[in-house]
Amino acid sequence: MDAPNPKRPCLVPLGTSSIENPCSLPIAPDFNQSNIDLTISSFLSLSDLPLFSLPLSIGCSFDRVLDNVIPSIAGTSRDEFDQDRFLDRTLQLASLLYKSTKRCIRKRATLQNSTSWPLLPELTIKVFSMLDTKSLMQASACCTMFNKCAMDRVCYSHIDLTTAAEDVDNGVVCVMIHRAGKELRSLKLGSISSSAEPTTSLLTRSCLTPLTFNHGFTGGHLRSLHLYHLRMIDCGSLSPVLSACLNLTDLKIVGLDNPLEQLGLLTRNCRLIEHLFIEIYGAAGLITDSSLLEFAANCPNLSSISLLGFLLNDAILQKLIKGFRRLKHINLSSSPEISGCFFRGLELCGKDSPLETLILRDCYILKESEVLLFLNSLLAGDFKYIRLIDVSNVDGLVCDGGNRTFEPRFPIEELKKQRSNVTFVAIFESQSSLSSSRFPLEELNKERPGLTFVAEFRSPSPSESDVRSPSPSSSSDSSSSSDSSSSSSSGESSDESGTEEEEDED
């Protein structure tokens, strides 16, 4: 039995198929476009006839015509070639008709969407500009109307590729930056999750090079640059990029493998920078006075600084606070060299200091006595703009004799009365304080092993440690929550502790 669709031999090699290029079809000498249009229109008007099975169906008409035409070609000198060419042309015409029909369907759908979609194109573009880049690409694939709106440069003003970090390579970044053009305002690259392996990133050292194209035209419009866990990027690759971003005001680098001495180099060309956040992987060297002076001179408008994991000592920190007169937010968490002695040198500038947020989480040698001295200065009226202080430490604070305490003696009640708008967070997590709590955890584990007990003490999470503008409502509730935080960590519980208890049964 013959195969249902036997493969015809290709006697003459053919070039590029004219299916993809309709203009490649041969044109008759007496070609008349209007006659062709009329013929096709007459052909398509037969759609009311049955399509298959019946003798008067269009399908049977096709079969009869082909059966009659093919024998008429037989007997010529090149009958096999002419038959193959005729059949190929028939398939090409059928394909062209199919593609034209699909285009017509899409045009009708676009017209219907434009009439039924409640938002104007300008508002749709505005909504799309608020989406992260991955969601924007998904929306653009829905229909032609959305695709046209998603191609507007405004939609790429804020490029966020952190939600699809594993699929982003240099080419994707280049295309996104090119689409944004002069509308580019912010760019986020990398994986926000710290658990992501650095090998999963497809980006290289040159991923930010498109910002320097055309003499830095696109980079000159950039205002915010956030890079997360891109180990291959260092100061050597960042410096030429930042030199093109002259209007940058917000720089955030999480996971920088770089010594502290390069701070001045990073900010040398970004004199408008206001918010600086840098977290390093390993220990960095101590910053020198010359580097600090260069850093301060490069960033006269700096109002928020977060240096996580740096080897900053108290002397450098004191100069840092005094050197930046506009500093409102300071986050120096995980700095192993800060003891708190810098508080003593801030008495002269304390009253008029614009400082609003001070975060010293997990500073290993931070002393209880120095924190107490700072709190007393608050009671005396210094730092009148401060709203948030965080000295939480998983290892506790250093007390007299070099020991560590998880129950520091802080004037919480006085602070609540005199500075009720200040949020003071002091959470010290330790196994001893947990075991000494009044919760029967051991008995609960024995009696109900499938039960999960969660006791959450209200405090800013580590991911929110880079606070810029704490709301007044949160500040007003801080006095009770901060008092409860310190008391709860020492194993004391009360009805006013502000502790949230939640039980979830697996």
From Swiss-Prot:
Q: Give the InterPro entries listed for this entry.
A: F-box-like_dom_sf, LRR_dom_sf
Ranges annotated as biased composition (Low complexity):
459-492
Annotated region described as Disordered, given as residue ranges: 452-506
Give residue ranges for domain F-box: 115-161
Q: Where are the compositionally biased (Acidic residues) regions?
A: 493-506
* Name assigned to this protein: F-box protein At4g02760
Give the source species.
Arabidopsis thaliana
